[in-house]
Amino acid sequence: MYYDFLVKIPENTGKISKNKRKDVTYIEYTYDRKYIPEKKYNVPLRTTIGKMDPSDPTMMYPNPNFEKYFPDVVLPDTEKDASRSSCIRVGAFLVIKKIIDDYKLQNYLGSWDDRGKGLLLDLAAYSIISENNAAQYYPDYAYNHPVLTPGHKVYSDSTISIFLSEIGEDERIAFLNDWNEKRNHREKIYISYDSTNKNCKAGDVEKAEYGHPKEDVGAPIVNYAIAYDLKNQEPLLYESYPGSVVDVSQLQYVLEKFQGYGYKNIGFVLDRGYFSRDNIAFMDKCRYDFVIMVKGRGSFVNQLILDKKGTFEIKRACYIDEYETYGMTLQSKLYADDEVERWFHLYHSIRRESAERTQLENELRRMEEAMNKCKGKEAALPKKYTHYYELTYHEKNGKQILYGYKEKADVIERELKLCGYFAIVTSRKMTAKDALLLYKSRDTSEKLFCSDKSFLGNRTLRVSGSNTFEGKVFVAFIALIIRCKIYTQLRKRKAEMINRPNFMTVPAALRELEKIELIRQPGGNYKLDHAITATQKTILGSFGIDEADAKARALAIGKELMHAEEPEKEEDEYGTIEDDKID
């Protein structure tokens, strides 16, 4: 390959020679000499470094060999490459691309064309690496990163916005169906199901309704839930549903979906928010096991705790070292008219007791301060005040004036006795330790929601319509699949290491991998800027990528970028304006 610019032919007459073949004169450089013993003389070893300009015998068109043997010569850059950065960050992309290939995610997008597949996966990679989901910043990301679209074509923010709004419900459902169809439906797995919500100020999102927000800002909300396979450590499905629908009532619809997917031998690990008699009965009907957390102050379990209080809290046989907690198991009916008995696992933690006692005392102190300020005034106090205090009101001029209050000592003392205790209810027989370890394994799914909001840029979705909202949630789920794999592989590798380095977290690892860069040479080809460091080798090794493999993959991307298509031009000089409307 010869570059499309001219340089002066080197004047080193001892090593520069010309070789004319047909109508072209090639410039050759003698880089070494080899002695031939039989003939007793040296043979020059030459390589072509360019071809002479027919109109000027002092100038030539160089090739990559010229850069190799004359590195000090400054070559002009080409105008063609101005649309792409001369420094391409390739490290994090290598890991994401390998996970995409290992999962064969493109195969689950069977109805999509190559452009659509590439653009969807590019948006997922963009949200992981940049921790952002704003369409108007995607071209900035693609300017200095490889992409998965054919020809490494970079699309404008307007195209991205249109693309997100055109992702149809059939395409989203087809992906989830295919993603779950390929699994072993007879394998025993436990699924963690959890939900969160996003505050919404957009007027055109159909699912935005007033409900029970995690963080109340006085705005409608949209609910969002994820089901996570705890054994294989992979997200299985996601749901978005109206904000007025309470979590406890949504669970039965999820169970029906898993029945439809054909899962035969599964159990659910659930937070206390999903505990209800109807949900328990429905899981029994589906023959699905369950593991549900219950607070020690729960009305149906606190008597069990008080009955067993003092019988296991210091017994070493009951100690669970992993969580510095004592636990015991007993069998009992969940409801008086239950046909089967459940297994109740009772736990006590000194640290939890201290924290809960402090929290309760502080809450009582704040309530008393509030009531003291309201004395002699008309006051409508929340219901929780009457739980802990007897309030005395006097009627004056038709108004209820707060006169005084008195602690309900028996109620407070009972709750103090329950501080530090909690319970887990399971449908299948297991030890207290097994039940706790199984429940605690759902921490990964909780981290998924943290990732969704903090590390994928989805604290704010920046949409104003239902179609774009659904498209961005779908992209976020694809990104969660990939990022979850990054998290589990790093955690697995870190557990094997004697030292626990702080660069083995997902944000730190991605930042370190972003330092692996391809630098564009004057001829348009890309080369690694420097050797891969020991830290980067450790991170890449977590994903089965060794140094040689990383170099080969990076250089292959560099060759593809040499022939990359021109970026799409933005028709509107002001770009696409997105509103920060869904938090």
Task: Specify the residue positions occupied by each region the protein language model found.
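Secondary-structure capping and boundary motifs in well-ordered enzyme cores
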Residues: 117-118, 130, 152, 156, ...
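Catalytic or ion-translocation cores adjacent to nucleophile or general acid/base/metal-coordination motifs
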Residues: 240, 245-256, 260-263, 274-318, ...
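Acidic, metal-ligating active-site segments
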Residues: 32, 205-230
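An anionic, glycine-rich sequence signature occurring as long contiguous blocks
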Residues: 220-222, 240, 289-438, 510-583
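Short amphipathic alpha-helical "interface-anchor" segments enriched in bulky aromatics
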Residues: 435-462
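Dynamic "connector" segments at or just before major functional cores
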Residues: 1-192, 196-202, 225-237, 242-244, ...
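Secondary-structure transition/capping motifs at alpha-helix termini
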Residues: 37, 145-152, 170, 184-186, ...
